């Protein structure tokens, strides 16, 4: 799976990248609360990082492909301070920090303590089922208790596209995050891939 993402970035096949802040985030960012340390797993070079920072949050991202991290800071004309760790390279500029490396090796100590909120548009849907089962428990170790989460998922007929992004059913979200309190904020047709007949969903979850 790791080689897949390195290949996609190297070949410029990044149709999953959104050039503007995600519409679910724009509408429901208030679910995260004010002035939080927000964890953004598998963040790529998402505009969402800048958007969250503009709202007064301190943003902690993690991205496997270091070239994507470099591209994010270069495209926003930010000159980051760079620190090498055992398994990650840390890039920090202002209120945005991104760790280049394996998300599953991220620790609370490395990121300066547990984060206070979570925004996930691209992480859960990027992982195959066997990794999704590991993702939620690991993510909880990086957060304070009862942290608010804004989650964006897609559901479509997996036979029509191999993924990633993978289809994540509503029932699976409820199973992965049980017994956390959760609300389905919105469900709408996936306008980016209408040929799949899929659904975009946004969730507010208290971890």
Give the location of each predicted region.
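Local beta-strand N-terminus motif with an aromatic residue
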Residues: 35, 114-115, 123
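Conserved acetyl-CoA-binding loop of GNAT-fold acetyltransferases
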Residues: 57
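Class I (Rossmann-like) S-adenosyl-L-methionine-dependent methyltransferase catalytic domain
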Residues: 1-36, 45-49, 61-110, 136-207
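A short, conserved alpha-helix within the catalytic core of class I
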Residues: 126-138
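Gly/Ala-rich phosphate-binding loop of Rossmann-like dinucleotide-binding domains
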Residues: 53-54
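A short acidic, Gly/Pro-enriched loop at the edge of an enzyme's catalytic core
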Residues: 108-118
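Hydrophobic, aromatic-enriched interface-forming segments
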Residues: 119-122, 128
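Class I SAM-dependent methyltransferase "Motif I" SAM/SAH-binding loop
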Residues: 39-46, 123
